Amino acid sequence: MKPAARRRARECAVQALYSWQLSQNDIADVEYQFLAEQDVKDVDVLYFRELLSGVATNSAYLDGLMKPYLSRLLEELGQVEKAVLRIALFELSKRSDVPYKVAINEAIELAKTFGAEDSHKFVNGVLDKAAPVIRPNKK
């Protein structure tokens, strides 16, 4: 699958996870509704599904990975920033095939696209500290 299709999968995952985090609906229902309502012809749908289920299943673990590096309480994080960080931390901790720099750079781009004005700086700061702990060899 093309890198652009992976990027689109991440973009869709941010949107779907944002909805899930706010609604607390079952992740399978969120996925079904998202895929029914969105044009996903240029999306790596399998990767989108993996990101959604992986983040939802591991959300407490992923939150634990980010907490030591947050400058504020987890509960005070914006929902977009939380979704972006969860995706990046999922890729860093559970998907060793995703290069270290790709996971971080994609997260920064997602934060620029969907987040508040300076959220990409916040996301970069958290990942800059967390990533070397998760992947000490930076691969």
UniProtKB/Swiss-Prot annotation:
Q: Which Gene3D superfamilies match?
A: NusB-like (1.10.940.10)
Keyword set includes Thylakoid: no
GO BP terms in the entry: DNA-templated transcription termination; transcription antitermination
Gene Ontology CC: cytosol
Q: Which SUPFAM superfamilies match?
A: NusB-like (SSF48013)
Keywords carried by this UniProt record: RNA-binding, Transcription, Transcription antitermination, Transcription regulation
Origin: domain of life: Bacteria
Query: Can you provide one Gene Ontology molecular function annotated for this UniProt record?
Result: RNA binding
A Pfam family: NusB
This chain's function reads: Involved in transcription antitermination. Required for transcription of ribosomal RNA (rRNA) genes. Binds specifically to the boxA antiterminator sequence of the ribosomal RNA (rrn) operons.
Q: Which family does it belong to?
A: Belongs to the NusB family.
Q: Can you say what this protein is called?
A: Transcription antitermination protein NusB
Q: Which species is the source of this protein?
A: Citrobacter koseri (strain ATCC BAA-895 / CDC 4225-83 / SGSC4696)
Gene coding for it: nusB
